[in-house]
Amino acid sequence: MEPVDPRLEPWKHPGSQPKTACTNCYCKKCCFHCQVCFITKALGISYGRKKRRQRRRAPQGSQTHQVSLSKQPTSQSRGDPTGPKE
């Protein structure tokens, strides 16, 4: 064991960083690649914001879904069935 400079932070010690970069793979080897991989992949802990998935848009030529929606009867609005009070 080689001596470590006590002024260095623990995460900057030699040998603390893996020689290969982290990947998006979730196999057992990659899950135990480093501490960050273990926490995020093996334990599933992430503190970042979750990205919202964008819906797939239909091609420009297909408007059939919108047409079929307009043919359906409109549902009554929820709320007071007697109407607005004045």
Swiss-Prot record:
There is a cross-link at residue 71 (Glycyl lysine isopeptide (Lys-Gly) (interchain with G-Cter in ubiquitin)). GO terms for molecular function: actinin binding; cyclin binding; metal ion binding; protein domain specific binding; protein serine/threonine phosphatase inhibitor activity; RNA-binding transcription regulator activity; trans-activation response element binding. The keyword Acetylation applies. It is found in: Host nucleus, Host nucleolus; Host cytoplasm; Secreted. The modification Asymmetric dimethylarginine is found at residues 52-53. Residues 22-37 are annotated as: Cysteine-rich. Coiled coil: none annotated. Zn(2+) 1 binds at residues 22, 33-34, 37. The modification N6-acetyllysine is found at residues 28, 50-51. A motif (Nuclear localization signal, RNA-binding (TAR), and protein transduction) lies at residues 49-57. Keywords: Acetylation, Activator, AIDS, Apoptosis, Host cytoplasm, Host nucleus, Host-virus interaction, Inhibition of host innate immune response by virus, Inhibition of host interferon signaling pathway by virus, Interferon antiviral system evasion, Isopeptide bond, Metal-binding, Methylation, Modulation of host chromatin by virus, Modulation of host PP1 activity by virus, Phosphoprotein, RNA-binding, Secreted, Transcription, Transcription regulation, Ubl conjugation, Viral immunoevasion, Zinc. A motif (Cell attachment site) lies at residues 78-80. Residues 1-24 are annotated as: Interaction with human CREBBP. The keyword Ubl conjugation applies. Residues 48-86 are annotated as: Disordered. Residues 60-79 have a biased composition (Polar residues). Its main location: host cell. Residues 1-48 are annotated as: Transactivation. Residues 38-48 are annotated as: Core. Gene3D superfamilies: Tat domain. One of its GO terms (biological process) is symbiont-mediated suppression of host type I interferon-mediated signaling pathway. Belongs to the lentiviruses Tat family. Interacts with host CCNT1. Associates with the P-TEFb complex composed at least of Tat, P-TEFb (CDK9 and CCNT1), TAR RNA, RNA Pol II. Recruits the HATs CREBBP, TAF1/TFIID, EP300, PCAF and GCN5L2. Interacts with host KAT5/Tip60; this interaction targets the latter to degradation. Interacts with the host deacetylase SIRT1. Interacts with host capping enzyme RNGTT; this interaction stimulates RNGTT. Binds to host KDR, and to the host integrins ITGAV/ITGB3 and ITGA5/ITGB1. Interacts with host KPNB1/importin beta-1 without previous binding to KPNA1/importin alpha-1. Interacts with EIF2AK2. This is Protein Tat. It comes from Human immunodeficiency virus type 1 group M subtype B (isolate PCV12) (HIV-1).
